Structure formats: C-alpha cells, structure tokens
Amino acid sequence: MAIYLVGDIQGCFNELSSLLLQVNFDRNNDVLYLAGDLVARGPNSLETLRFVKSLGESAKVVLGNHDLHLLSVHAGIKKAKKSDNLSALLAAPDVNELMDWLAAQPLLQEIPNTCSNSNAINQANNNSAYMSHAGISPQWQLSVALEQAKFIQTKLASSDRNTWLALMYGEKPNDWHQAITEIERFRYSINAFTRMRFCFTDGTLEFEQKDSPENITLTNIVPWYELSQTINNTSWVFGHWASLMGKSSHPNIYPLDTGCVWGNQLTMLRWHDKKYFIQSSELSD
C-alpha cells in the first residue's frame, strides 16, 4: 500500500501508464495523487481522463489551469486553440460525463502519511502534506486556502458552473486583501491555486514570468514558496512550473512538473520514502 504523486500529465497517457507499471501500482490498495493539468497539448487527453476517472477513490486529483480551460471550452465560454489538442476529447460520446466528473474535483488535497485504508485518506492529519496545482498564496494561512478551495469546488459543482467559469478570467485582483467581493475572491483563488509561480515581494501575485528562479534578473519578484509561512510547518506538492524541473531550494517543497509534454519527462514520487520515478517523454526529439 503506497501513495504516489505525479506531475502534469497533459495528455501524455503512455508515459503515465509506463510509470504505473514501473511502480507496480495496485488500484485496490495504492492511491495516485495527480497535480493537475491532466489534459491539453499532449496526444491522449481523452484516454487520460477516462483512466483517472476509472480509478475512483484510488485517484486524488487537483484541478490545474488547463483542466479549467477545458471546462470553459466545453461550455462554449472559450474557443480551443489548435495547440490544446482537445478535438478527440470534445467529440467523445462520454464528454459530458467526463466534464461533470472533472468539474467536481478539488483544487487542494491533503496527503496523509499512511495509506492503510480509504478512511485514512479523508482524515485530517497534522503531519500530512498538501497538494495543489501551483502552490499556496503567501498571503494565505492554510485555513484560508482550505476554505477557498471548498468555496471554489462548490461553485464549479453547482448548476451555475458556467457562470463561475466565465468569471474566473483576469489577473485582478492579484492582492488577497483587495479581494472583497465573492467574485474577486473566486478569481484570486483560482489564480493562486492554478497560475501562480512568482510573487512580488509584498506577496501579491505576478503572472508574467515562467522561467526558473536562477534565470530571473528582476529583484522585485521571488518564488511564491520563499514568501509562504505555511510551508515552514507543512510540505507542499505542486506541478505547473516546468522550468523548475523538479528542483527547489526549500526542503518542504516538492515540484513535480518536469515538462513531459515539452519532451522532457514525467515524474512520480512515492511519498513514504520520497523515491522518485522518471519516465522519458515520447514527445522528445
């Protein structure tokens, strides 16, 4: 019985399958945590969604920005780009069922230390870590992140899903203290959970830079995890930031996006012993 955590798949289903074979994943006993961006750009988004959904309680998903974009495209709010590579998924006979399932997934998951049974997964554990697609806002305490994740999940699972999806676009407010209305809190929280990489030194969100920190010459921005107080007391697992290539200067941080869809590799982490498993991308030159 083990907990495995995997980075951004983005439709790279063959690489995911190879990793699961590497670790002898047992869906009846093991649990797979997925750091978001299950879909887009890669060749097999439909197969990825169908498989993860089929795992039932053995899969714990957090939504990423590409997953949310897919929901918006399906709802007619946004148009798919050719590079999104979503045509087969959107034309699938079970697309509505898949979208309902996807929309019901959270933006934040707790990762327990043990995996003895399904109940243990749902029990609060003071020593456990957390996973979200991009991280946790340095302007939040953990209690606020949990509250906002529940708030968003409720909205996206409601009959007003499409209304809320349309409201999530935009980069303002990028300061939690200026997020006064319900809509502003929704948009800020979506951005913090799924788009954040760097923050300005006052903790506000910065959206332009995607490079690794060592390549950034700007002095007024830092990685979100260098400002967060939450991660001094708990570990955080996230994806989204491919240029980190799984590396971080902070001991409680576990970046798992290693750019499989860009031809690099898909990374999986076995939680109890922190052992990494790597599968090279089939999209490499």
Curated annotation (Swiss-Prot):
It catalyses: P(1),P(4)-bis(5'-adenosyl) tetraphosphate + H2O = 2 ADP + 2 H(+). Keywords: Hydrolase. The keyword Hydrolase applies. Its EC number is 3.6.1.41. It comes from the Bacteria. Coiled coil: none annotated. It is an enzyme of class 3 (hydrolase). GO terms for molecular function: bis(5'-nucleosyl)-tetraphosphatase (symmetrical) activity. The keyword Hydrolase applies. Hydrolyzes diadenosine 5',5'''-P1,P4-tetraphosphate to yield ADP. Belongs to the Ap4A hydrolase family. This is Bis(5'-nucleosyl)-tetraphosphatase, symmetrical. It comes from Colwellia psychrerythraea (strain 34H / ATCC BAA-681). The lineage of its organism: Bacteria, Pseudomonadati, Pseudomonadota, Gammaproteobacteria, Alteromonadales.
